[in-house]
Amino acid sequence: MNKRYPILFLALGVGVIAINLISCVSIPKGATAVKPFKKDKYLGKWYEIARMDFKFEKDLNNVTATYSLKDDGSIKVDNRGYNYVKKEWKQSIGKAKFVNESNEGRLKVSFFGPFYAGYNVIEVDSDYQYALVAGNNLKYLWILSRNKSIPENIKQQYLRKAESLGYDTATLVWTKQD
């Protein structure tokens, strides 16, 4: 029976390593997260202006993300959007934690247990009204606003920044907000 313990510990160790690898959070090459980042100013409701499309947001418009502080110091993430094909609202509740320090806009977000993805605020205006957010890699990008629209000069600034990092901004989906 003692011979089974090393195998059990090995299996547990491999499992922990696998979860850490799957939950790997990173930032696209050349990108840097906002620092200093003011968490309290970032909390609240954001409207999605544009995104790189992926399966969890397919066919959604009127997308919002609302961030609120939880008692344990993590951030509650409440994403909502209207599926215009199925004619129904979709909601996803998750949590976000800071990767390093809370004064740096590098977070990891999870909607599925121990599995995290990168959420990197790489640009935000001084009033925290507009934000450019990168995921783990060049497949994930969001332009956010506190309002349902964004000024053209901010939009162009964020597009230039994304392109300088290697994003193909021609593939952005411009989210309908009505």
Residues of each region from the PLM?
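A beta-rich soluble binding module of mature secreted/lumenal proteins
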Residues: 2-178
